[in-house]
Amino acid sequence: MLCISVAPVSRKLSKADLLNAAGQCDLIELCLDHFLKEPDVGDILQGIPKPILVACRRPQDGGKFAGTEEERMTLLRQAIVAGPQYVELDLETAPKVPRFGKTKRLISVMSLDGPPDDVDAVYDEAAKVNADVIKFAWPAPTFEAVWPLLKIISQKRQIPTVGLAVGRGAVTLALIGRALEVPWSYAALERGLESVPGQPTVSDLKDIYCWDDINSKTRFVGLVGPVDRQTAITARALNAAFRKLDDRHRCLPLPIQSFDRLGERLERLKINAVLVAPELARAAAEHAEKREGSAESSGCADLLIHQQDGWTAYQKLWRHAAKVLEDRLGRKDEHDHPLDRRNVLVIGCGGLAQAFIHGVQRNKGIVSVTAANEKGAQQLAQKFNVRHVPFHNLYDTLADVIVIAEPSIQMGHGKADINAGYFRTTMAVMDLSAMPDDTPILAEARARGCKVVEPSDVFRAVLAAQFESLTGKQFPATVWDDVLANEP
């Protein structure tokens, strides 16, 4: 089930929010601690066609209630008399609030310092205060912090258990919980109405991650990296393609802290493939048991696939980004290589730069590398035996192709910025740092008459190659245009 958290500040807003949520979920959590004035819960609940879970949390539990503890207890008792399906009680409050009517008791264990030392002991304590459902919640900014919550909600216990991840791991927990068929997972009604930081909205879960499609037979494809706009677009596009081909795979964001023990945990979740964000490409290649040719030679990986002999790393970006660039340079056929003997300046020293340098070299381009991080650029130049250009000498260095491969590079006049005057009409410019989105650098390059390689074209080409590796099928041609048309 899906539980939408509603945290209104006024009685007038609460009615509208509850009715809005009712059409999109199975259970509604009404957070009384956000009200500016004491609400009439009985009146608010009248006419709401979905079961209600009432909560009124203390600040130490992540709530907003500003009154005294006695006032909070009074409000909870009044709420129970109104007859909601559930009332949330913390371990300290529960013994003071007797069971009343048909309202079930959700005993909440919020631990702002992380998982309790003894989960079983806490579970037993919650059972003693007449819990019908037990909720465990703690900060979970990473997949590693989500993992103990996953272990708890996946265990078969006498009393049903739900979990709430506070932070970026909330989407991950909600989606896996859906596949595990836990009693419910939490979502916010819309952006700005989250009951806890990092809570996904109902549209995030349904429109991006295909909540309604997920069940015990779903096979997840991990998206390793930050839970950001690029991850959302990747998930939306891949999920649309999976759905169009009637494939049971769906995307799962994995905001990891490191690759340590990741493979073991993925195997326990029966996840056999992950796409890797550019900033983690080098670490992904290092942690794989095997590296396919380009992943070995570039030292980067954007795709990991689990096989019988372990995890194998693949690098898809170099080939397809280089192909899109050469198409923009006027490639005539598959035997023509416009990069041959062209001077290509790569700006950046991270995983994107490393992968692309490998691609340019494979296409016989002449590579130079520069970055505001001089040490990183020097090391990259040594690794690939290419020319290093000190960043302060950038404006004395002319090139046929400029490739931005570092998100920190901006237009401007600072020491680590690029001045617009650098661009010439003879240049081709490619910015990989914010794919598939456009950037101010590309806008300036267009205005100055440069040949611009569209980042959405590169993103689509790489994503299509990854999709084919995952499924053995071609990426549906119409999906990408549909996804871009619906992006804000």
Predicted regions and their residues:
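Rossmann-like adenosine-cofactor binding region
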Residues: Q382-D457
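Short, conserved loop/helix-junction motifs that constitute active-site signature segments
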Residues: Q46-G47, R99-G101, P338-L339, Q361, ...
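Active-site beta->alpha loop and helix N-cap motifs at the rims of alpha/beta catalytic domains
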Residues: M1-D118, E125, A131, W138
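Adenosine-phosphate binding glycine-rich loop
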Residues: L329-R331, A428, L432-P488
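Glycine-rich adenosine-cofactor-binding loop
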Residues: A165, V221-D228, A313-W318, L325, ...
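Glycine/small-residue-rich loop that forms an oxyanion/phosphate-binding "nest" at active or ligand-binding sites
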Residues: I52-K96, A283-D336
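Phosphate/diphosphate ligand-binding glycine-rich loop within oxidoreductases
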Residues: T218-R331, P436, L442-E444
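Catalytic alpha/beta core domains of metabolic enzymes, predominantly
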Residues: E92-F220
